[in-house]
C-alpha cells in the first residue's frame, strides 16, 4: 500500500517531525494531514509547504483549503506550522520568499525564522479572525502563544524608535498587542533591532517589504540561539564580539626598520551572517609586535594604517594586510583589546563579567599610601617583647607584606622584594599559562623574559650575563621553580614562582631588637651533674634588674626561708614569676635580720604582694614552693627518704644566710604538708627538668 511521508517543522522547535499517511503522494490533502495532527490545535496554526514556482524556484506556499492537494517532492511533503498570531498573509496568496540567497540548511533548521511569505504585511486584514477563541487548549500551546505575543510586542515597540501601531485585534488579544513588522511607511529608513540582540546589525534603505520581513525574522532566529546570554548594545555587528567587551581600543605604531617582520598570525571568524572580523592568533618572538608588547593574542584587528577592517571580509582583510606589510615605513595597528589576554580558546570570554578583576593587595596598598590610613611598617606598637623584637624582621621578610614606600630595586635588594615586584600585573613581565608537551603550566614565565626583566628593572647589572646569574640564584633559593624541578637555569625553559610562604622559615626573631628591655634575661642553670650549692655563696653572676622595674626593688635576692609568693600554699600550683618570688623590700630585710634568733616568726605583719596577702600564714622556714626558683633552696633530706643527690650528704644541717632566720629540716614539716615532700625531692634531684620559664 502506498504511503506518504510528511516532514513538518513545529513553531520554534529546531528538530522536525515525521508522520506517515496511508495515502498515495499524489492524492494526499491538507485534511489528511490535519487528521494526523488531531492531538494539536491545528486551527491555531498556518500551514506552509515546500513548493516549486516557475519564476522563483523553491518557495514556501501557504495552503489553507482542506481539500487542496499537498505538493510532494521525492515522495515526501515538507511543511512548516506557524502560529497564527505571528503571521499575516493575504488570503489565497501564493508567496515567494525573497531570501533564497540563504543556504538550504539554514532554511530547514532555522525553525519559523525563515517561514514568512513575501506577501507578509502588517496593514493587511487578518484572515484568522476568531481563531483566538480557543480556551481549552493544551498548556504547551498557550505558553507558545503567550511567548509569541510578548516577542511581537517587543519588536513592534522598538523598531528604530517608531511608535507602536494603534491597530487592535478584535477578539482574544490584550489591548496592547500590535503588529510585528515593518510596514510600507518605514521604507527608506534605517532601523536597529531590540537591545536584547547581542550583535546589532546596521541596515539602511529598506525599500521592500520582503527584505524587511527577512531581516526581522533573521534577528529573531539569532535571538533564539542566544537566549541564555544577555548581550550588550553596540554599533556594528562586525566589531562587537566576545573579545571586545572591554571596549579598550589601542593604536600601536611599529617601526619596521628595526625589525624584519611583523610577527603575527591572524584568525578569521565567520558565521551565517558573514565574516565576523580578524583576530590576533599568535605572536612570534623577534617580530615588531612582540617587541612592542601591547598587542596580545585574542585582540581584534580593527584598522591597519588608514584601512578600516570593520566592514571588510576576511579574505580582503588578509590581502590588504599583506600589501601593507610589503611596503616600507611604519605600520599603525588599531586593535580592540581582549578581555582575557590568555584565553583557552578564541571567543570564549564570558559576557557576565566584562571587567578585569583587581588585585586586592595592590588596591589596598595604593589606597593606604594615598590616605595614610596605615602606620609605617616597623613602628607600630606591639604588645609583647616577642612581637617587638620580630616586627621589623617580619615586615622585611614576609613576602606578602605590601610596601607603602617603593624603593628602586638593586642587586642588593632582598630577593623576595624583587620577586614581589616581578609578579605585579603591571611589572612588564609576561606571566601567563603556557603549553609544554600538552601540559598546561599555569602562570609561567620564560627564562629569557626573566633575565631581560632583571637586566631592565634592577639596578647594578653591568651586563646581561650578571642578570642571568641573578636569575639562577632565584632558582637556587626557591623563588623560581622549574616544572620538573631542574636546578640549572636555562633561558629556554618555563618557570613558575615558588611558594612564598616557604620564606617564613628564614625569619629571625632577634633581628631588629635593641635595648635590654626587649630581650629575655634568663640566668644560666647549673649542670644536673654538678653539686647543688646549699648554704654557700652562689658562683653564678646574675644580671641586675631590667631598667623597667620600679626603684623600690633591689637586686633579686634568694630567700632561704618563707619569702616566696603565695603560690606556695597550693600543692600543685606553679609560679610564673619564679625570678621575682625571692625579691623583698629593704624594710623586710631589716626585720628579718632583727628576728634572726627568734625562729621563723610570722610574716602576716609584712606587706604581701597584691592579691596574696590574705593567704600568708605562719609557715616553717624549710618549706619551699615547687614553683619558686631553684636558687631558693632548703635544708637537709628528710629521714627515711633517699638523698636527692649524692653530693648533698655533707649538707645535713644547713644554716641560713648571715643574719637570716634558721632553716628547719624537712622532717619537721607538719603532717598536713607532707604530701608535697615527694614532688619537692624530685625537683631537687634534677631541677632543670622541672624549671620552666614562661615568656
UniProtKB/Swiss-Prot annotation:
It is a peripheral membrane protein. One of its GO terms (molecular function) is protein kinase binding. Its main location: membrane. It comes from the Eukaryota. GO terms for cellular component: clathrin-coated vesicle; cytoplasmic vesicle; cytosol; dendritic spine; glutamatergic synapse; growth cone; lateral plasma membrane; microtubule. Ubiquitinated; undergoes both 'Lys-48'-linked ubiquitination, leading to its subsequent degradation by the ubiquitin-proteasome pathway, and 'Lys-63'-linked ubiquitination. The interaction with INVS is required for ubiquitination. Deubiquitinated by CYLD, which acts on 'Lys-63'-linked ubiquitin chains. Residues 425-499 form the DEP domain. The modification Phosphoserine is found at residue 194. Residues 1-85 form the DIX domain. Residues 625-636 have a biased composition (Polar residues). Disulfide bonds: none annotated. Keywords: Cell membrane, Cytoplasm, Cytoplasmic vesicle, Developmental protein, Dwarfism, Membrane, Phosphoprotein, Ubl conjugation, Wnt signaling pathway. GO terms for biological process: axon extension; axon guidance; canonical Wnt signaling pathway; cochlea morphogenesis; collateral sprouting; convergent extension involved in neural plate elongation; cytoplasmic microtubule organization; dendrite morphogenesis. It is found in: Cell membrane; Cytoplasm, Cytosol; Cytoplasmic vesicle. Residues 142-151, 215-228 have a biased composition (Basic residues). Residues 251-323 form the PDZ domain. Residues 89-237, 543-667 are annotated as: Disordered. The DIX domain promotes homooligomerization. Participates in Wnt signaling by binding to the cytoplasmic C-terminus of frizzled family members and transducing the Wnt signal to down-stream effectors. Plays a role both in canonical and non-canonical Wnt signaling. Plays a role in the signal transduction pathways mediated by multiple Wnt genes. Required for LEF1 activation upon WNT1 and WNT3A signaling. DVL1 and PAK1 form a ternary complex with MUSK which is important for MUSK-dependent regulation of AChR clustering during the formation of the neuromuscular junction (NMJ). PANTHER family: SEGMENT POLARITY PROTEIN DISHEVELLED, SEGMENT POLARITY PROTEIN DISHEVELLED HOMOLOG DVL-1-RELATED. It is linked to Robinow syndrome, autosomal dominant 2: A rare skeletal dysplasia syndrome characterized by dysmorphic features resembling a fetal face, mesomelic limb shortening, hypoplastic external genitalia in males, costovertebral segmentation defects, and renal anomalies. Belongs to the DSH family. Interacts with CXXC4. Interacts (via PDZ domain) with NXN. Interacts with BRD7 and INVS. Interacts (via PDZ domain) with VANGL1 and VANGL2 (via C-terminus). Interacts with ARRB1; the interaction is enhanced by phosphorylation of DVL1. Interacts with CYLD. Interacts (via PDZ domain) with RYK. Self-associates (via DIX domain) and forms higher homooligomers. Interacts (via PDZ domain) with DACT1 and FZD7, where DACT1 and FZD7 compete for the same binding site. This is Segment polarity protein dishevelled homolog DVL-1.
Amino acid at each position: 500500500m502506498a504511503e506518504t511521508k510528511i516532514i513538518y517543522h513545529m513553531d520554534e522547535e529546531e528538530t522536525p517531525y515525521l508522520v506517515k499517511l496511508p495515502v498515495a503522494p499524489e492524492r494526499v490533502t491538507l485534511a489528511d494531514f490535519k487528521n494526523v495532527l488531531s492531538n494539536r490545535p491545528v486551527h491555531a496554526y498556518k500551514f506552509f509547504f515546500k513548493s516549486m514556482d516557475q519564476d522563483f524556484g523553491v518557495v514556501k506556499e501557504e495552503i489553507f483549503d482542506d481539500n487542496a492537494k499537498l505538493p510532494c517532492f521525492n515522495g515526501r511533503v515538507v511543511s512548516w506550522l506557524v502560529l497564527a498570531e505571528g503571521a499575516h498573509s493575504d488570503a489565497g496568496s501564493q508567496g515567494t520568499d525573497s531570501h533564497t540567497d540563504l543556504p538550504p540548511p539554514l532554511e530547514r533548521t532555522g525553525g519559523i525564522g525563515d517561514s514568512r511569505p513575501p506577501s507578509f504585511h502588517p496593514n493587511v486584514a487578518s484572515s484568522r479572525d476568531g481563531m483566538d477563541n480557543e480556551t481549552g487548549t493544551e498548556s504547551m500551546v498557550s505558553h507558545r502563544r503567550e511567548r509569541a505575543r510578548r516577542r511581537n510586542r517587543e519588536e513592534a515597540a522598538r523598531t528604530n524608535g517608531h511608535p507602536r501601531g494603534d491597530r487592535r485585534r478584535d477578539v482574544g488579544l490584550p489591548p496592547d498587542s500590535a503588529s510585528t513588522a515593518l510596514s510600507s511607511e518605514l521604507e527608506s529608513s534605517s532601523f536597529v533591532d531590540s537591545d536584547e540582540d547581542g550583535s546589532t546589525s546596521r541596515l539602511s534603505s529598506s525599500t521592500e517589504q520582503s527584505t524587511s520581513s527577512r531581516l526581522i525574522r533573521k534577528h529573531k532566529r539569532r535571538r533564539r540561539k542566544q537566549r541564555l546570554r544577555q548581550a550588550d548594545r553596540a554599533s556594528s555587528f562586525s566589531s562587537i564580539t566576545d573579545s571586545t567587551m572591554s571596549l579598550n581600543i589601542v593604536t600601536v605604531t611599529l617601526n619596521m626598520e628595526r625589525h624584519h617582520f611583523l610577527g603575527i598570525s591572524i584568525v578569521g571568524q565567520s558565521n551565517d551572517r558573514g565574516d565576523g572580523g580578524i583576530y590576533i592568533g599568535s605572536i612570534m618572538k623577534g617580530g615588531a609586535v612582540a617587541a612592542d608588547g601591547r598587542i596580545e593574542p585574542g585582540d581584534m584587528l580593527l584598522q591597519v594604517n588608514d584601512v578600516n577592517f570593520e566592514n571588510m571580509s576576511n579574505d580582503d582583510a588578509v590581502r590588504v594586510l599583506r600589501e601593507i606589510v610589503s611596503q616600507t615605513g611604519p605600520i599603525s595597528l588599531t586593535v580592540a583589546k581582549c578581555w582575557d589576554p590568555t584565553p583557552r580558546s578564541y571567543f570564549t570570554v564570558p559576557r557576565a563579567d566584562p571587567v578585569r578583576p583587581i588585585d586586592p593587595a595592590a588596591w589596598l596598598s595604593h589606597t593606604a599610601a594615598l590616605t595614610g590610613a596605615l602606620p609605617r611598617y616597623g613602628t607600630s606598637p606591639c604588645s609583647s617583647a616577642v612581637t617587638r623584637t620580630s616586627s621589623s624582621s617580619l615586615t622585611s621578610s614576609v613576602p606578602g607584606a605590601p610596601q607603602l614606600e617603593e624603593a628602586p630595586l638593586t642587586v642588593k635588594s632582598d630577593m623576595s622584594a624583587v620577586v614581589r615586584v616581578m609578579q605585579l600585573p603591571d611589572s612588564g613581565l609576561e606571566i601567563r599559562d603556557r603549553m609544554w608537551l600538552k601540559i598546561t603550566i599555569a602562570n609561567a614565565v620564560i627564562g629569557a623574559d626573566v633575565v631581560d626583566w632583571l637586566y631592565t628593572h634592577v639596578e647594578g647589572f653591568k651586563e646581561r650575563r650578571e642578570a642571568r646569574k641573578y636569575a639562577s640564584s632565584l632558582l637556587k633559593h626557591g623563588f623560581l621553580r622549574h616544572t620538573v624541578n631542574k636546578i640549572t637555569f636555562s633561558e629556554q625553559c618555563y618557570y613558575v614562582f615558588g611558594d612564598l610562604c616557604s620564606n617564613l622559615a628564614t625569619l629571625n626573631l632577634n633581628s631588629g631588637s635593641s635595648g635590654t628591655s626587649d630581650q629575655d634575661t634568663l640566668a644560666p642553670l647549673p649542670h644536673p651533674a654538678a653539686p647543688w650549692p646549699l648554704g654557700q655563696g652562689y658562683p653564678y653572676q646574675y644580671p641586675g634588674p631590667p631598667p623597667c622595674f620600679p626603684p623600690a626593688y633591689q637586686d633579686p635576692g634568694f630567700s632561704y626561708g618563707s619569702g616566696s609568693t603565695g603560690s606556695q600554699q597550693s600543692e600543685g600550683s606553679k609560679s610564673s614569676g619564679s625570678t621575682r618570688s625571692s625579691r623583698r623590700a629593704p624594710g623586710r630585710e631589716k626585720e628579718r635580720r632583727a628576728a634572726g634568733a627568734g625562729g621563723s616568726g610570722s610574716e602576716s605583719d609584712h606587706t604581701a604582694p597584691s592579691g596574696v596577702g590574705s593567704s600568708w600564714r605562719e609557715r616553717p622556714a624549710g618549706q619551699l614552693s615547687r614553683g619558686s626558683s631553684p636558687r631558693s633552696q632548703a635544708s637537709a633530706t628528710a629521714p627515711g627518704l633517699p638523698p636527692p643527690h649524692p653530693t648533698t650528704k655533707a649538707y645535713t644541717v644547713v644554716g641560713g644566710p648571715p643574719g637570716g632566720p634558721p632553716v628547719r629540716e624537712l622532717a619537721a614539716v607538719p603532717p598536713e604538708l607532707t604530701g608535697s615532700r615527694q614532688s619537692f625531692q624530685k625537683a631537687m634531684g634534677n631541677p632543670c627538668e622541672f624549671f620552666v620559664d614562661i615568656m
